[in-house]
Amino acid sequence: MNQISKFIDSTLLDLGRQFKLSYLPPLMIYLAAGISGLTGIVGTFFVKDYLNLSAAFLAGLGFWAGIPWALKMPLGHLVDLIWNKKNYMVYVGATLIGLSLLIMYGLIIHTEWMSTILKVETWFVISVLLAPIGYVVQDVVADAMTVEAVPIVNEEGQKFSQDQIKAMHTTMQTLGRFAIIGGTVLVALVNVILFKGVDSLEQADKIELYGSIYIYALVIPFVSILGVIFANYLKNKKKNKLIGQGLVGNEDNYEHEKTEINWWILGGSLIFVIFTLSVGSFGVPFAQEIVFLGSMVIILFLMSKLIKELPQNLRSTIVGTAVIIFVFRAMPGPGPGLSWFEIDELKFNEQFFSILSLLASVLTLLGIILLRPFMSNNSIAKIIVVLSIAGAILFLSLIHISEPTRPAL
């Protein structure tokens, strides 16, 4: 019992003790990313029942929606270049997310009017592509804000030691993961409440509920913008306090080194964007395969340029880690077809999906807590191997229930 209490203290309570108010702004942006799943269940049912899009089309669209995340590196470089103005990127991201949500609201509630402007399928594609662009823009800024969130001096203006600063960075990163998963738990709870008794609703009432959830989801960009405003407030508050103590006031400012423009990153990324848009827009056969191969060539070229600037002892580690993560991320998933099977064959409704989502989010949160020592004491290669094996075992149940029933011989 004593060991359990020590474990809880070291994994949970200690995080609470290490929390600082300056951590809150980036955590709010991470929380916004977590609560982005609020519309996931609505989107699944609405697309399936009303848009007449195939699971294959949605799987293909998912490929294109993932492209913005491939631009995280050049966007991170852009953040370094405009460091003092990076908060404006959060507003850009929030605007794109808000537009995506409003388009979906319009498709659900004002379908006929929207279809007079563009085809319903076109509106849906625009919405699906806008959202990840907004989230990736906000994500790179949140990553940068975590650096600034760690204080350099205490309330009296005394500098923290390097060990203390390193420990605070570790805490900040851990809390960031908690904020994202905590957001998924929160929206799962909200969905369970909103979808209570959904089967008894008339079709018109169900449509109204779907639309209202997209309106509720506008809290997502609002939370991220609030994080930026709160960050500026905390920064000015501490500056004024330090000035009141007879100091200059910039003692707690993160000294960001001026970043030189890396034209290889920006130029290569521009080529990547033009190449992707060209192939995708002109309906080239095997567009996804061409984009994949082309983007691999561009990314490998950029990595080769970046690796040359790293110390020799780090090059192999970076390349090995990149290969492992690529293989892990490249593993194909079941796509939307699995959700449709669960709806049509297993008769899952919106509330049951919400309950499953809640269970998955809570288990993920517990996994982060319980496996924290394992993750900190093992290499990324070992962690990914263990996760892959565990995922394969858990997926066996889905394979079993999806097999057609065979008549007895």
Give the predicted meaning of each segment.
Residues 1-21, 113-115, 119-125, 149-334:
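Intracellular loop-helix junctions on the cytosolic face of multi-pass helical membrane proteins
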Residues 5-66, 319-345:
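Helix-loop boundary and gating motifs at the non-cytosolic
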Residues 55-62, 169, 349-357:
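Juxtamembrane helix-start elements in MFS-like secondary transporters
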Residues 61-68, 356-364:
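Transmembrane alpha-helical segments of major facilitator superfamily
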Residues 71-84, 367-382:
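Helix-to-loop junctions at the C-terminal end of transmembrane segments
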Residues 88-103, 383-397:
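Structural signature of the two symmetry-related core transmembrane helices
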Residues 137-154:
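Intracellular juxtamembrane helix-capping segments at the cytosolic ends
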Residues 399-409:
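Single conserved hydrophobic/aromatic residue that forms the stacking wall/gate
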